């Protein structure tokens, strides 16, 4: 459907500058995250309500819930890390980007995105540390991993990622 293709182009076009800004400046601009979240909810509503009012309401609720879970979850992890190790483990921009992705991808898509982002960040961080390019306490951005994970989930879908990540068994 053309509307889903348009939504995909919009999402990917929105994630690219966020990825690049975070890589360069370790910063995710809140206005870009906020507008991206609203665009995600708007596209979700348009696509959902085209399938009927009940579907539209359910889909919009699901994606709103995912955005809220992302925001609270990421801010909670950051606050817990600050309490345990004396500094936040994530920037608040990461929480806002995760909320944006929840608005676009829903709970399942958000979960897959986070798994991909954590794995990607761990691999790149480990390589950076082992190669000496990343210092022991040197921060590096997590936003690009979230953005790339979200893009991968949008492009290949849940059915591709869930079995690959071992989160569900093969379909009979």
What are these regions, as identified by a protein language model?
Residues 1-7:
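Transmembrane helix-loop-helix
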Residues 44, 98, 122-129, 150:
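Hydrophobic transmembrane alpha-helices of multi-pass small-molecule transporters
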Residues 91-93, 127-152:
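Interfacial loop-to-transmembrane junctions
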């Amino acid at each position: 459907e053309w509307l889903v293709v348009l939504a995909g182009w919009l999402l990917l076009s929105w994630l690219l500058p966020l990825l690049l800004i975070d890589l360069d400046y370790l910063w995710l601009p809140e206005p870009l995250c906020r507008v991206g979240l609203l665009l995600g909810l708007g596209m979700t509503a348009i696509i959902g309500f085209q399938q009927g009012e009940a579907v539209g309401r359910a889909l919009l609720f699901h994606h709103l819930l995912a955005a809220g879970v992302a925001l609270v979850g990421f801010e909670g992890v950051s606050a817990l890390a600050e309490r345990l190790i004396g500094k936040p483990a994530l920037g608040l921009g990461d929480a806002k980007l995760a909320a944006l992705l929840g608005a676009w991808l829903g709970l399942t898509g958000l979960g897959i995105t986070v798994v991909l982002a954590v794995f990607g960040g761990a691999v790149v961080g480990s390589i950076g540390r082992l190669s000496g390019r990343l210092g022991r306490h040197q921060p590096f951005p997590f936003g690009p991993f979230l953005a790339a994970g979200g893009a991968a989930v949008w492009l290949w879908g849940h059915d591709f990622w869930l079995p690959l990540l071992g989160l569900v068994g093969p379909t009979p």
